[in-house]
């Protein structure tokens, strides 16, 4: 067991694409952990999707033995964290397992919004932060400007920031020396009762749930009986070890160390991220603070395009939930789409990733309904309820008040595009709170916005309005009363539940009109006329018609009596009427996507 003063636990904080995973790769190579033969980009991102999108979704840990220049042998535990705002809770738990962090900033781009959010999380956990300027080999790199930006926006002293190029490996050895010299060693009591923090867990089909943890106090040995605070359940440790970066089995781990255990835990929900492990016979009195249940924020319906795939979808969702405790689902039926599931996600990226994994790993073709958020309702009879599906909203006469979630958003943008950003935020019912310069040409704008307005197309429009230069970060603040209405879409007088949305009263007419027009373009023409109507309650606010396809029934009449032609046309008209009464309109997949793309025009 290494001595505590020779252990360093750290994580790497960076905005997407600033070189976090590349720096981790170089550290593994410089310390000789990964040979040239095993080398591959983004070594710690095990999921194919993580490597393809260039993002880190799950937290990982790796134990790195390092001999410093003074000859001492150290154990460095790198805890790789996700960088995206959706996975904020995972980031906060990973940071709670560390004493220090490397703040990696792209020397050509400067400080971005999500970097700031994660740095503030690190400072909340009292971590020592070392600034690292990456990509200094690029011609566009401006290290002095970026140092100034970091000092201005975060207040970190950058006089001894390390300038590196993770791509070429330049100065990576200096980063390792800085970790050893400047980051504090863990403080834990080996003789105290066991207390260990779970910062990640995943499901393995052979060993059950694998738990990644950091020991705060005490010693954990193979064969010990342990219990978890949140569930009060007890287990026996069957396997104990560390990732270095492949699995190395251990017999014991002490305070300050990071490792994994297997204990025949059957469900991921039993080993929640942020929970505390302790011994059954000598339990700790209080858990590690900061544990909270993760609540889904965004909901949408997922339906198989072929109803025969329903069981396959169910199996796929069960498998995904084993590895993602923040993801929730429950069965639901839709008159338009048949049987499917209502799924809850942490945010938009999370939703995209789950959908992509379902299609890629399980080959399930999906129809996804428009995403919605959780609304709170006070009914006239004094009851309170939460609604995550617009089609479940009660009749407007029964609603006393409707509340929607608001978020506080920080947007970092070059000053050339400030006008576009302000226009977009105002259009999305935002309330401007603050605006200031963090550098001569970069502005940070703070807005409070309804979460429902971000869910649709906000991120895409922000990127296109700023040529990709803007970055954003948001956090949930509270629920506020709003003038919201449910907008129904009727096709030939029948409401299509999967197209119902909750919108602000001021936007209802414009949205209803745009959606009806979009549907007119996507629904194929039928043998009878199709009426598309947008309605609030009983009131129709917009209508579009798709004209019928018709055969030229008078083609066989050459000259002759007009009454003959009229008779044939009347007969056709009767047939169309009967068809309209009996006929069903098949809605293509594009019709449901139309609801997601209304704001694009």
UniProtKB/Swiss-Prot annotation:
Q: Name one Pfam family in it.
A: EFG_C
Reaction equations catalysed? GTP + H2O = GDP + phosphate + H(+)
Q: Does the keyword Cell inner membrane apply?
A: yes
Q: Which UniProt keywords apply?
A: Cell inner membrane, Cell membrane, GTP-binding, Hydrolase, Membrane, Nucleotide-binding, Protein biosynthesis
Q: In its UniProt entry, what is this protein called?
A: Elongation factor 4
Family assignment? Belongs to the TRAFAC class translation factor GTPase superfamily. Classic translation factor GTPase family. LepA subfamily.
Which segments of the protein form a coiled coil according to its record? Answer: none
Specify the superkingdom.
Bacteria
Supply one GO CC term from the record.
plasma membrane
User: In which compartments does the protein localize?
Assistant: Cell inner membrane
User: NCBIfam families from the xrefs?
Assistant: lepA, small_GTP
Q: What intrachain disulfides are recorded?
A: none
Instruction: Say where the protein is mainly found.
Output: membrane
Q: Where does GTP bind?
A: 17-22, 134-137
**Which GO MF terms does the UniProt record name?**
GTP binding; GTPase activity; ribosome binding; translation elongation factor activity
Membrane topology, as annotated: Peripheral membrane protein
Q: Which SMART domains match?
A: EFG_C
Residues annotated as domain tr-type G? 5-187
Question: Which Gene Ontology BP terms does the record give?
Answer: positive regulation of translation
């Amino acid at each position: 067991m290494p001595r505590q003063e020779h252990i360093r636990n750290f994580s790497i904080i960076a905005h997407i694409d600033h070189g976090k995973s590349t720096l981790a790769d170089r550290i593994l190579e410089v310390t000789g952990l990964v040979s040239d033969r095993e080398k591959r980009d983004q070594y710690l991102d095990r999921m194919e999707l993580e490597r393809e999108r260039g993002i880190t979704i799950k937290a990982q840990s790796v134990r790195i033995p390092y001999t410093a220049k003074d000859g001492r042998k150290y154990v460095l535990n790198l805890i790789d964290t996700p960088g995206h705002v959706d996975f904020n809770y995972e980031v906060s738990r990973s940071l709670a397992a560390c004493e220090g962090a490397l703040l990696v900033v792209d020397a050509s781009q400067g400080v971005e919004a999500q970097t700031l959010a994660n740095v503030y999380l690190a400072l909340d956990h009292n971590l020592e932060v070392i600034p690292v300027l990456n990509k200094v080999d690029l011609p566009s790199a401006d290290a002095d400007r970026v140092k100034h930006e970091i000092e201005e926006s975060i207040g970190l002293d950058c006089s001894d920031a390390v300038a590196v190029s993770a791509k070429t490996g330049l100065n990576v050895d200096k980063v390792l020396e800085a970790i050893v010299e400047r980051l504090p060693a863990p403080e834990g009591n080996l003789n105290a009762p066991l207390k260990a923090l779970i910062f990640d867990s995943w499901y393995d089909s052979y060993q059950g749930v694998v738990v990644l943890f950091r020991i705060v106090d005490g010693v954990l040995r193979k064969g010990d009986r342990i219990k978890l605070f949140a569930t009060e359940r007890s287990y026996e440790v069957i396997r104990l070890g560390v990732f270095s970066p492949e699995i190395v089995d251990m017999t014991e781990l002490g305070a300050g160390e990071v490792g994994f255990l297997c204990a025949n835990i059957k469900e991921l929900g039993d080993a929640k991220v942020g929970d505390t492990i302790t011994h059954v016979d000598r339990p700790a009195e209080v858990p590690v603070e900061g544990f909270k249940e993760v609540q889904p924020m965004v909901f949408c319906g997922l339906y198989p395009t072929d109803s025969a795939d329903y069981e396959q979808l169910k199996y796929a969702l069960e498998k995904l939930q084993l590895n993602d405790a923040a993801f929730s689902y429950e069965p639901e039926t839709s008159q338009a789409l048949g049987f499917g599931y209502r799924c809850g996600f942490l945010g938009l990226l999370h939703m995209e990733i789950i959908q992509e994994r379902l299609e890629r790993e399980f080959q399930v073709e999906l129809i996804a309904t428009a995403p919605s958020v959780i609304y709170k309702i006070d009914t006239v009879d004094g009851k309170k309820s939460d609604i995550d599906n617009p089609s479940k909203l009660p009749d407007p006469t029964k609603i006393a008040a409707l509340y929607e979630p608001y978020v506080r958003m920080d947007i970092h943008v070059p000053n050339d595009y400030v006008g576009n950003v302000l226009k977009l935020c105002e259009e999305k019912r935002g309330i401007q709170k603050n605006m200031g310069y963090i550098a001569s040409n970069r502005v940070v704008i703070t807005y409070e916005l309804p979460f429902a307005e971000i869910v649709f197309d906000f991120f895409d429009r922000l990127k296109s309005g700023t040529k990709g230069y803007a970055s954003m970060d948001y956090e949930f603040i509270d629920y506020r009363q709003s003038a919201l209405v449910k907008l129904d879409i009727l096709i030939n007088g029948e409401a299509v539940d999967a197209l119902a949305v909750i919108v602000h009263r001021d936007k209802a007419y414009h949205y209803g009109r745009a959606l009806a027009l979009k549907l007119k373009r996507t629904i194929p023409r039928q043998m009878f006329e199709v009426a598309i109507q947008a309605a609030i309650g009983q009131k129709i606010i917009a209508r579009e018609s798709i004209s019928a396809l018709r055969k030229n029934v008078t083609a066989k009449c050459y000259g002759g009596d007009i009454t003959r032609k009229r008779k044939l046309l009347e007969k056709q008209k009767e047939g169309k009427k009967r068809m309209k009464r009996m006929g069903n309109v098949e809605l293509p997949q594009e019709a449901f996507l139309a609801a997601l793309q209304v704001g694009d025009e």
